[in-house]
């Protein structure tokens, strides 16, 4: 009987201790004989406060992690693989600049193509013009003449007279109207030789020196004298000297 009482007393004083080897933890004491009230007084759940060293370590790790990597903004990274927003903006700006530059170059090329082409060029310091168009009033088909093969106005006028009035079958009727060779430069015939310069103005052939003429001529026209009256008046004596002067 005494043994049973002592055993019961020993059981009532039995304590259950819980602890962790991580250090510093408190033990929860639970008594069997306390009933519900005793359980509420002696028994409770372990929390982070019971392990101060562990909690401090986790807090320190969280703080160091937060300090080493700042929070990522949604506007900071776009696309995949990730591309910085500033780099994306740079790419967009470069593309826009490239498009604007291409449009500007295309516009310059179009303007350049629309400009009248200069038929003159220099070879070994000498002006080389090449072939230019020649038209005559009353003749539907035009011709071309090589200015490089001529050295003076007289030589050029003689070539054009032979071209339109002696070798062209379509001008037989015109040739029969004249009993003497045409004089395109002295104003003694029904026709006069004119040219269009690079500025688009029609001028009388022979009013400037030969070199200046071949640098500015675009095309020739054998025009009726009645239609050429509005052009600049010619000074016959100075022009005669310029026409006969070789290059």
Curated annotation (Swiss-Prot):
Molecular function in Gene Ontology: DNA-binding transcription factor activity; identical protein binding
Induction data: By auxin.
One Gene Ontology biological process: auxin-activated signaling pathway
PROSITE patterns per UniProt: PB1
The entry's keywords: Auxin signaling pathway, Nucleus, Repressor, Transcription, Transcription regulation
Region (Disordered): 25-44, 49-119
Biased composition (Polar residues): 87-98
SUPFAM superfamilies: CAD & PB1 domains
Residue ranges of the motif EAR-like (transcriptional repression): 14-18
Chief localisation class: nucleus
Signal peptide: none
Record-stated family: Belongs to the Aux/IAA family.
Function comment: Aux/IAA proteins are short-lived transcriptional factors that function as repressors of early auxin response genes at low auxin concentrations. Repression is thought to result from the interaction with auxin response factors (ARFs), proteins that bind to the auxin-responsive promoter element (AuxRE). Formation of heterodimers with ARF proteins may alter their ability to modulate early auxin response genes expression.
PANTHER family cross-referenced by the UniProt entry: AUXIN-RESPONSIVE PROTEIN IAA13, AUXIN-RESPONSIVE PROTEIN IAA17
Complexes and interactors: Homodimers and heterodimers. Interacts with TPL.
Protein name: Auxin-responsive protein IAA13
Phylogenetic placement of the source organism: Eukaryota, Viridiplantae, Streptophyta, Embryophyta, Tracheophyta
């Amino acid at each position: 009987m005494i043994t049973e009482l002592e055993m019961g007393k020993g059981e009532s004083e039995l304590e259950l201790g819980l602890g962790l080897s991580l250090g510093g933890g408190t033990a929860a004491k639970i008594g069997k004989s306390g009933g519900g009230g005793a359980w509420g007084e002696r028994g409770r759940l372990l929390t982070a406060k019971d392990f101060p060293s562990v909690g401090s370590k986790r807090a320190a790790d969280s703080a160091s992690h937060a300090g080493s990597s700042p929070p990522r903004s949604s506007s900071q990274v776009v696309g995949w693989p990730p591309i910085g927003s500033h780099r994306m903006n740079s790419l967009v700006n470069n593309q826009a600049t490239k498009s604007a530059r291409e449009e500007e170059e295309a516009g310059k090329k179009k303007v350049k193509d629309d400009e009248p082409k200069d038929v003159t060029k220099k070879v070994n310091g000498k002006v080389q013009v090449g072939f230019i168009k020649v038209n005559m009033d009353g003749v539907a088909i035009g011709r071309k003449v090589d200015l490089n093969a001529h050295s003076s106005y007289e030589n050029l006028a003689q070539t054009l007279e032979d071209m339109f009035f002696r070798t062209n079958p379509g001008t037989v009727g015109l040739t029969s109207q004249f009993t003497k060779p045409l004089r395109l430069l002295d104003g003694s015939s029904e026709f006069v030789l004119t040219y269009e310069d690079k500025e688009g103005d029609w001028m009388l052939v022979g009013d400037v020196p030969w070199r200046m003429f071949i640098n500015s001529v675009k095309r020739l026209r054998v025009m009726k004298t009645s239609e050429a009256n509005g052009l600049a008046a010619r000074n016959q004596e100075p022009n005669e000297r310029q026409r006969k002067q070789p290059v």
